């Protein structure tokens, strides 16, 4: 369960950070 959350976070956090910071 926890590794799945970590995998999803690792997949989506960069995209969210990219969208917020506008640094892609």
UniProtKB/Swiss-Prot annotation:
It comes from the Eukaryota. One of its GO terms (biological process) is killing of cells of another organism. GO terms for cellular component: extracellular region. The keyword Cell inner membrane does not apply. Keywords: Amphibian defense peptide, Antibiotic, Antimicrobial, Disulfide bond, Fungicide, Secreted. Expressed by the skin glands. Pfam families: Antimicrobial_1. It is found in: Secreted. InterPro entries: Antimicrobial_frog_1. Its main location: secreted. Disulfide bonds join 18-24. The keyword Glycosyltransferase does not apply. Antibacterial activity against Gram-positive bacterium S.aureus and Gram-negative bacterium E.coli. Has activity against C.albicans. Belongs to the frog skin active peptide (FSAP) family. Brevinin subfamily. This is Brevinin-1Bd.
């Amino acid at each position: 369960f926890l590794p799945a959350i970590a995998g999803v976070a690792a997949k989506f956090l960069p995209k969210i950070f990219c969208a917020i910071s506008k640094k892609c």
